[in-house]
Amino acid sequence: MEPKLLLSAHKPLFVSCNSPFNEKTKLSVKSGLPMSTIRAARSQFMGEGLILGNKYGFWSTSRKTRVVVEPVRAAVKRRKELTFDSVVQRDKKLKLVLNIRKILVSQPDRMMSLRGLGKYRRDLGLKKRRRFIALLRKYPGVFEIVEEGAYSLRFKMTSEAERLYLDEMRIRNELEDVLVVKLRKLVMMSIDKRILLEKISHLKTDLGLPLEFRDTICQRYPQYFRVVPTPRGPALELTHWDPELAVSAAELSEDDNRTRESEERNLIIDRPPKFNRVKLPRGLNLSKSETRKISQFRDMQYISPYKDFSHLRSGTLEKEKHACGVIHELLSLTTEKRTLVDHLTHFREEFRFSQQLRGMLIRHPDLFYVSLKGERDSVFLREAYRNSELIDKDPLTLVKEKMRALVSVPRFPRRGGPRKDEEGREVEIDGSDADGEEEEEESDAEEWSDVDGYLEGEDGGNDDDGDWTDDEGEEDVPPNFDDDDEDEEEDSVKIGLSPSSRKSSSPRKKEEKVLTPVFPDGTPREKW
């Protein structure tokens, strides 16, 4: 068939015959494997697709149908709270001091040279070429520099810091039973009742474990747990399940709250309130839909972190409810009821956490707070804090607060601050305690009385009111703008004087500045 060309003025040029280029492409797949094509539903990506649906084919056993589960989404905006951020900020210096102390106590006599400390510059996170002697002198309450020879400088802990360190070691030995319970509860929450020691070491400081817990606590109690080798390293495995320990802190607090509320209200009929209010942080304004989602999530049935959760599917509300319960219980085991978000991500395999763990924590502002202060994000258990202070403080936390007080001791104390006696106790200088120092301070008080009166804004408390009325007429005289530089210097010196002294010197000054009127040629001018 020969092609015919049709020309038209209002239509473009086209071929009238059926060209093979205009036909739809047909794909044929030929293979030795038996397969059948089934008409599938229209997809949003590929349109109408083909599904290999032979029930008894080669791929039937290896290819399973996957059910798409949408992740739980609750777009809650994070609000910055200074009460929690200040907790992270005030521990910034303390963290550096504790790291230096950890290096120092590893020495035989707890004394180290500054040259030896320079080898740990990278471990301490010090990037700049900073002199260690200047760094240690910033904390005179913790470290003391000792000179041995002309070019040998060594440092050690002060007597107060040494005493605090010994108290901390004593408290850790007394709380060893509590630390064993924390390890048992941590392993009991895992899915396989086994956790790698390398992962537990990330939480050793937060849980209050000693540095050598692998060789001490993990080896002393084989009736509770044991260390087993694994292809990924040694792991702590549970050997005895205690049902009495399988009670979370949330369940205990719920029972206590219910008992206390029933006693306070003295209700005749025990019934839930008609309207359940969601307690949110101050300043966090959420929409009605977001508040409703948080309320519905809170009213869901509580899933204990110690129950078997292998049947829970990831991405469901039930799995997120269980994950929040695990994190709540894990934070309640820590000494300060907070930890780093990165530490929690190490336990994704043991607790089946989602990949968006930080987002899950932000979605529940009524339970947790995520602080972005510092190099790494921190998560707080909200109910354990009142403003920026812990409600129930661990003995190790009390020791840490004393250490923080030593870190904040300034190198040069301010004048007028509290003084310390020989035993290191603060002494307030009262009238009865400072009898011997009154004579030494009398001269200073006389010299600085005018300056203090000017700074405090006093109106001449010891002066009579009549002294101010004698010079009222002189204040109405306009100022003289023809002063010399020497007069300006005298005025600048007398700025710090009290009003009474400045008033007494003004008549003498004006007598010296009396000028006679003259003509331009210098002849005196008559007064009228």
UniProtKB/Swiss-Prot annotation:
It comes from the Eukaryota. Residues 410-528 are annotated as: Disordered. Its main location: plastid. Residues 1-73 form a transit peptide. Residues 429-491 have a biased composition (Acidic residues). It is found in: Plastid, Chloroplast. The keyword Lyase does not apply. Keywords: Chloroplast, mRNA processing, mRNA splicing, Plastid, RNA-binding, Transit peptide. It holds the Pfam family PORR. RNA-binding protein involved in group II intron splicing. Binds specific group II introns and promotes their splicing. Functions in the context of a heterodimer with the ribonuclease III domain-containing protein RNC1. This is Protein WHAT'S THIS FACTOR 1 homolog, chloroplastic. It comes from Arabidopsis thaliana.
